[in-house]
Amino acid sequence: MNELTSLKAAAVQFQHQASNKKYNLLIMEKFIEQAALEQVNILTFPEMCITGYWHVPKLTAAQVSALAEPIVDSPSLTLLRSLAIKHQMLIGAGLIERADDGRLYNAYVACMPDGSMHTHRKLHAFEHPAISSGDNFTVFDTPWGVKVGILICWDNNLVENARATALLGADILLAPHQTGGTDSRSPHGMKPVPLALWEERETRREEITAAFKGPSGREWLMRWLPARAHDNGVFLLFSNGVGADDDEVRTGNAMILDPYGRIVNETWAAEDAMVSAELDLSLLAMSTGRRWIHGRRPDLYQILTQPQGYERDAISARFSNVPPSR
């Protein structure tokens, strides 16, 4: 294993087309070629970017199944695997997986330079009743001497998931999303970005930039995302959709954070974009979060694994208007 002192990473935001895998893969190929020119080692695309995202809740179970692909024989992943081998790059991408037992998952696959693949199944899937939630954390070795973990979108909002991924050894967290501009049930959470604003973005540049940087976009991310990197001493690669996604507008904000929660590179452009950065791996060892983790007292934390009686399934927790009871 060739251990490096730094490596190049990149995060992509792009507007996918619903169920149009051919189009989405063409866009992804262009970014992969751009990343190869920049000698990127790790490239991350958004959640469900191959299949499309927010139209899925409106599909029938049969339509969702038809959109899904088995991981091993996936035509989409066959293409990405070949490009990962060609460019000696880790390429992460999201799709709907059809497992051997027929169950469906919101999955994110890391295609490795040697042709192998690592698959994470979203732990808190709420996109469709036909899509099951995964039951395992995902952390794996890379050719560059660092371990990579994956958490998909809402997985990152529950702090336990990020901590568990760090405890399993992750140095870099891939955090693919489809977020921003959602109609949060929380009074001071995200709110919709008008579709008309996106459609008129060329003539309303200041307004669309303000929306993407505001409380339904970047401001919302800044309330919690840097803490996932800082508190766990990991680099974090945030990739996201951008633009109209059915009846919502994704706010992009692709960014890369270091183990201190500092933003190394980001964009708030209202367009398809890629941000890249050199990750200084020497920052990991003495980062604040890693030092704090060594002060843990696991004997006190049994409460974290004990059901409290008010837990809900992901769909209910995400969409219910009934206030949580405690």
Predicted regions and their residues:
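Cysteine/selenocysteine-centered motifs that mediate thiol-based redox chemistry or coordinate metal-sulfur cofactors
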Residues: 149-171, 175-177, 284-326
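N-terminal glycine-/serine-/threonine-rich phosphate-binding loop
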Residues: 1-42
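CN hydrolase (nitrilase-like) catalytic-core segments centered on the catalytic cysteine
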Residues: 72-92, 147, 156-274
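Active-site beta-strand/loop signature of hydrolases that rely on acidic residues for catalysis
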Residues: 9, 24, 35-62, 84, ...
